[in-house]
């Protein structure tokens, strides 16, 4: 009935002032930060402003307390696939405490804008300036990262109120030198490519949730040392999050 997701890629050893480590395209990062999210609210497609709805989330040590807030793009085609089937579907991005207020300031200043502004008579794109200044501050070639994913689904099991939880915390691989972000994105793509080659996915193009069988996909993740934890909990009442 209600599905809540949290995820993020973070440095294992955060360095001030930004407590972040760039592990993919900075253009992709600012796209997520600057663009509205698309969620399901009351069963309907709903556009939500980025850099809003700040909350605190607790994880087991050594992760600890993190911030979570709205950014764009995290759900891809899921809202359209599950419109009318779920009441709530949302995804929040995880960052270290104190990150939100800094990022919100960049957003409010317009530093992620793509519209040129005049500086000493010269048109300048604020986002290009931000990329040039910010990227060196969050680039750590020797740094080690982690990827965190948590999903909470609220509904019923055998007619009784229940919650299903899925959690993954993956770390930089010292043996291969792969970052956690590389592991999570690269292995996922490779697994699906193999499944396509074996004829285990339907032909055509659609959202991954329609095309990839979850059971076999999870088994392939386990072969690559991803530790996905799943649990089902009976709860009292019929509340939301």
State where each predicted segment sits.
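C-terminal catalytic/substrate-binding lobe primarily of soluble NAD(P)-dependent oxidoreductases
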Residues: 2-241
């Amino acid at each position: 009935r209600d599905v809540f997701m949290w995820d993020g890629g973070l440095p294992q050893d955060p360095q001030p002032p930004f407590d972040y480590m760039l592990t993919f395209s900075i253009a992709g990062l600012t796209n997520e930060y600057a663009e509205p999210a698309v969620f399901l609210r009351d069963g309907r497609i709903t556009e939500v402003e980025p850099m809003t709805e700040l909350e605190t989330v607790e994880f087991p040590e050594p992760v600890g307390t993190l911030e979570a807030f709205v950014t764009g793009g995290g759900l891809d085609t899921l809202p359209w696939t599950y419109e009318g089937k779920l009441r709530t579907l949302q995804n929040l991005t995880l960052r270290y405490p104190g990150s939100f207020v800094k990022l919100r300031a960049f957003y409010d200043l317009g530093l992620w804008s793509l519209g040129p502004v005049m500086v000493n008579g010269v048109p300048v794109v604020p986002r290009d300036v931000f990329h040039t200044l910010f990227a060196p501050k969050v680039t750590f070639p020797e740094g080690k990262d982690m990827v965190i994913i948590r999903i909470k689904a609220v509904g019923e099991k055998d007619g009784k109120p229940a919650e299903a939880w899925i959690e993954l915390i993956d770390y930089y691989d010292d043996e291969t030198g792969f970052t956690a972000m590389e592991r999570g994105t690269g292995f996922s793509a490779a697994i699906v490519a193999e499944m396509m080659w074996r004829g285990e996915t339907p032909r055509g193009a659609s959202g991954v949730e329609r095309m990839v069988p979850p059971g076999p996909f999870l088994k392939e993740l386990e072969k690559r040392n991803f530790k996905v934890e799943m649990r089902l909990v009976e709860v009292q009442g019929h509340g939301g999050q």
